Amino acid sequence: MLSRKQNFVNRILFGSHDRNINFDNFDFTTITISVFLAFFGILMVSSISFNELTTRHIFNLMVGSVLFFFIFRFEMSTWRNIDLYLIFLSLFLLLILLVPNLAPEINGAKRWIRFLGFSFQPAELAKLSLLIYVSSFCIRKKEEFKSNWTGFWKPIFIMVSLISLILLQPDLGSSAIIFLVTLTIMFIAGAPIIHFIAISMVGLFTFILMIFLVPWRFQRILTFMNPWENAQEGGYQLTRSFSAIGRGDWFGTGYGESWLKLNLLPDAQTDFVFSIILEEFGSFFGLILIFIFLVLVIR
């Protein structure tokens, strides 16, 4: 017999579907952490940016929450049945980015599709699609996957196809994430160690090659290693972020009391938000936040 709380949650999540939640397996830790991080994100965006960005952030969070409840209504088997369709959709959207004048160029890269006032990054769908596809493939083709090269290379081919299109944007970061996540799943699923080592070496060599063949990428690595050498140009953001961290010390200056966010640290609301968190809340809270993220990853 379901409790009143369980009946309420079932109606919210599944509507009229005859499906119940097994609360013994329900990961309340993950849900609690996710909700905390979502609300903390709102606080930091409010502290760093203008009202317009805060409103947009809250709206995007609401849209994401609706999508979460919608996706949660379906069994995992449903997503496994449409994994290839998701892959084809990802490939199609990534190809659209290559069509002239269809996608905006931002900071020298074409990564976003704008539609009806929304901005969407196809690489994010590609990550999710590949995650579902590789996981499903390792279950469906377990023996083939473990016993021969053919079974191993099928998901690798899909991965390389997606990465190739993402590199054309260019977006080396998303490509590296997709590569690492795919290999991690395959390793956990029991991929032959010789296959795993071979593809890892190829991937590492390609990653290094992509850095050295593109001058600005190589320069970024050098700047990252010693940002103070070019503190007024390439290393400006890094040195400013270090200043924010140092100003916050262990316990911070207080919520909303950051100085570096006042046009002294570019992209403070995106790439360097963690520096502002450490400035306002301190390095001690920063360590706690890192621990929370580690718990989320482990869960």
Short names for language-model regions:
Residues 65, 175-186, 201-204, 221, ...:
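Hydrophobic transmembrane alpha-helices of multi-pass, membrane-embedded glycosylation machinery
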Residues 2-32, 36-169:
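Membrane-helix boundary/helix-loop-helix interface segments in multi-pass membrane proteins
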Residues 104-112, 119, 195-288:
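Hydrophobic, glycine- and aromatic-enriched re-entrant/interface helices and adjoining loop segments
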Residues 186-196:
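Short loop segments and helix-boundary regions at transmembrane helix junctions
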Residues 66, 74, 133, 208, ...:
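Transmembrane alpha-helix boundary/anchor motif
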Residues 48, 52-55, 153-185, 213-218, ...:
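Helix-loop-helix junctions and helix-breaking kinks within/between transmembrane helices
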Residues 284-299:
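Hydrophobic transmembrane alpha-helices and their immediate junctions
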